[in-house]
Amino acid sequence: RRDDKIFDETAVVGVQEFASRLQSGLVPNFARWADLTAGSEIPKENREEINNELDEVTDYVFEVIQNSNFAQEVHESFMDLAVGTGILACEEGDAINPVRFAAIPLPHVILDTGPDDSIDHVFRERKNIRFNQLEQLYPKAKFSPEINSMVQGAGDKTTTVLEIVCRNYQSPNVTANFHYAICMTTKSVIFKREMEGLGSNPFICFR
């Protein structure tokens, strides 16, 4: 047990209170805690019109967030932040749940920093993944004949998937990341994509 050295409730209550206060102060439930507005490069005479359009976009964004599992998962991430680093994964969903969030416990990942001391590599080990779940987890994955046979007929057999997100420094003028998924049973890459743009990293890491 990880809590066998805890002799009173001070730490447990303190972590819960820390996470609750942080959530209510930064990202309160059922509130619009951020706004999309025109930047300084937009001419002043066009800003009002653009801000009105962005206001509608902001409403839609927060409607999606509030109908997702963001509130629950960000609270767990803030609890991790109380004792170290919080990691929140944001992934594309489906028509019912357009966005899915997942709080990733720190023992499940390894973080590495780049030349500017920011986190630029995330290694996540996903254990006990059933082969017949791989298609749902990675819809755009390309399976080798060996893995495809396991996906179709492995039943409840499980594998470990290593996910890696790393910064692409060959594109210095744009924020770009590579995202890999490796099936550790065959040691082969089943999924690879390149993501560009600020916020393209699906792992949000904060300290």
Where are the model-predicted features located?
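Extended, helix-rich architectural segments
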Residues: 1-160, 166-176
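A detector of the onset of the first functional module/processed chain
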Residues: 161-162, 183
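Extended, charged amphipathic alpha-helical segments
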Residues: 169-207
